[in-house]
Design a protein with these regions (language model features):
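Mid-chain, well-packed structural core segment of small domains
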Residues: 64-86
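Structural signature of tandem alpha-helical TPR/SEL1-like repeats
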Residues: 19-30, 53-65, 87-99, 121-124
Length: 124
Protein backbone atom coordinates (compact mmCIF):
# COMPACT_ATOMS: atom_id res chain seq x y z
CA UNK A 1 0.00 0.00 0.00
CA UNK A 2 1.35 3.42 -0.99
CA UNK A 3 1.97 6.11 1.58
CA UNK A 4 -0.46 9.03 1.45
CA UNK A 5 0.69 12.01 -0.58
CA UNK A 6 1.32 15.42 0.94
CA UNK A 7 -1.89 16.58 -0.74
CA UNK A 8 -3.94 13.77 0.80
CA UNK A 9 -2.43 14.48 4.22
CA UNK A 10 -3.13 18.19 3.80
CA UNK A 11 -6.76 17.55 2.85
CA UNK A 12 -7.24 15.17 5.77
CA UNK A 13 -5.64 17.65 8.17
CA UNK A 14 -7.67 20.60 6.93
CA UNK A 15 -10.86 18.55 7.19
CA UNK A 16 -10.05 17.80 10.84
CA UNK A 17 -9.11 21.43 11.38
CA UNK A 18 -12.42 22.66 9.97
CA UNK A 19 -14.22 20.18 12.23
CA UNK A 20 -12.45 21.75 15.23
CA UNK A 21 -10.37 18.66 16.00
CA UNK A 22 -7.14 20.62 16.35
CA UNK A 23 -5.03 17.99 18.09
CA UNK A 24 -5.91 15.32 15.53
CA UNK A 25 -5.33 17.75 12.66
CA UNK A 26 -1.71 18.26 13.68
CA UNK A 27 -0.85 14.62 12.93
CA UNK A 28 -1.45 14.57 9.14
CA UNK A 29 -0.37 18.19 8.79
CA UNK A 30 2.99 17.48 10.46
CA UNK A 31 3.47 14.59 8.04
CA UNK A 32 2.52 16.82 5.11
CA UNK A 33 5.08 19.41 6.26
CA UNK A 34 7.76 16.70 6.34
CA UNK A 35 6.98 15.92 2.70
CA UNK A 36 6.56 19.55 1.58
CA UNK A 37 8.47 21.81 4.02
CA UNK A 38 8.37 24.80 1.67
CA UNK A 39 4.62 24.70 1.06
CA UNK A 40 3.09 27.79 2.71
CA UNK A 41 -0.46 26.39 2.62
CA UNK A 42 0.61 23.32 4.61
CA UNK A 43 2.52 25.40 7.14
CA UNK A 44 -0.33 27.87 7.57
CA UNK A 45 -2.85 25.07 8.15
CA UNK A 46 -0.46 23.41 10.60
CA UNK A 47 -0.04 26.74 12.40
CA UNK A 48 -3.82 27.06 12.70
CA UNK A 49 -4.08 23.53 14.11
CA UNK A 50 -1.26 24.13 16.58
CA UNK A 51 -2.82 27.41 17.69
CA UNK A 52 -6.16 25.69 18.21
CA UNK A 53 -4.38 22.97 20.20
CA UNK A 54 -2.85 25.73 22.38
CA UNK A 55 0.68 24.89 21.20
CA UNK A 56 1.49 28.56 20.71
CA UNK A 57 5.27 28.43 20.32
CA UNK A 58 5.00 25.81 17.59
CA UNK A 59 2.22 27.83 15.96
CA UNK A 60 4.42 30.94 16.04
CA UNK A 61 7.22 28.97 14.40
CA UNK A 62 4.94 27.82 11.57
CA UNK A 63 3.45 31.27 10.96
CA UNK A 64 6.94 32.76 11.12
CA UNK A 65 8.04 30.37 8.36
CA UNK A 66 5.09 31.44 6.22
CA UNK A 67 5.93 35.11 6.78
CA UNK A 68 9.55 34.44 5.78
CA UNK A 69 8.42 33.15 2.39
CA UNK A 70 5.44 35.50 1.98
CA UNK A 71 6.08 38.70 3.97
CA UNK A 72 2.82 40.31 2.82
CA UNK A 73 0.59 37.42 3.91
CA UNK A 74 -1.66 39.39 6.23
CA UNK A 75 -3.28 36.31 7.75
CA UNK A 76 0.06 34.69 8.61
CA UNK A 77 1.26 37.99 10.11
CA UNK A 78 -1.91 38.25 12.17
CA UNK A 79 -1.64 34.65 13.38
CA UNK A 80 2.05 35.10 14.20
CA UNK A 81 1.16 38.13 16.29
CA UNK A 82 -1.70 36.32 18.03
CA UNK A 83 0.56 33.35 18.82
CA UNK A 84 3.12 35.69 20.34
CA UNK A 85 0.38 37.39 22.37
CA UNK A 86 -0.75 34.03 23.74
CA UNK A 87 2.84 33.45 24.83
CA UNK A 88 2.77 36.78 26.68
CA UNK A 89 5.24 38.30 24.22
CA UNK A 90 3.19 41.43 23.52
CA UNK A 91 6.12 43.63 22.50
CA UNK A 92 7.17 41.10 19.82
CA UNK A 93 3.54 40.77 18.71
CA UNK A 94 3.23 44.46 17.92
CA UNK A 95 5.17 44.40 14.64
CA UNK A 96 3.38 41.55 12.83
CA UNK A 97 -0.02 42.75 14.08
CA UNK A 98 0.72 46.31 12.90
CA UNK A 99 1.77 45.01 9.48
CA UNK A 100 -1.34 42.84 9.19
CA UNK A 101 -3.63 45.75 10.06
CA UNK A 102 -1.80 48.00 7.58
CA UNK A 103 -2.16 45.43 4.81
CA UNK A 104 -5.86 44.92 5.56
CA UNK A 105 -7.15 48.14 7.17
CA UNK A 106 -10.76 46.98 6.78
CA UNK A 107 -10.17 44.11 9.25
CA UNK A 108 -11.45 45.38 12.59
CA UNK A 109 -10.16 42.25 14.37
CA UNK A 110 -6.62 42.96 13.17
CA UNK A 111 -6.83 46.50 14.56
CA UNK A 112 -8.31 45.32 17.87
CA UNK A 113 -5.49 42.83 18.53
CA UNK A 114 -2.85 45.31 17.31
CA UNK A 115 -4.12 47.89 19.80
CA UNK A 116 -4.29 45.31 22.58
CA UNK A 117 -0.66 44.30 21.96
CA UNK A 118 0.41 47.96 22.06
CA UNK A 119 -1.38 48.58 25.36
CA UNK A 120 0.00 45.46 27.02
CA UNK A 121 3.53 46.07 25.77
CA UNK A 122 3.42 49.68 26.96
CA UNK A 123 2.11 48.57 30.38
CA UNK A 124 4.95 46.09 30.84
Amino acid sequence: MASPSAYDLFRNGTRLLEDGDFHAATVPLLRARELEPGKASVREALGRALFGAQRYQEAADEFGAVVQSAPTNDYALFCLGRSLQMLGRHDEARHPLALASTLRPEREDYRRYRDRARRRADAA
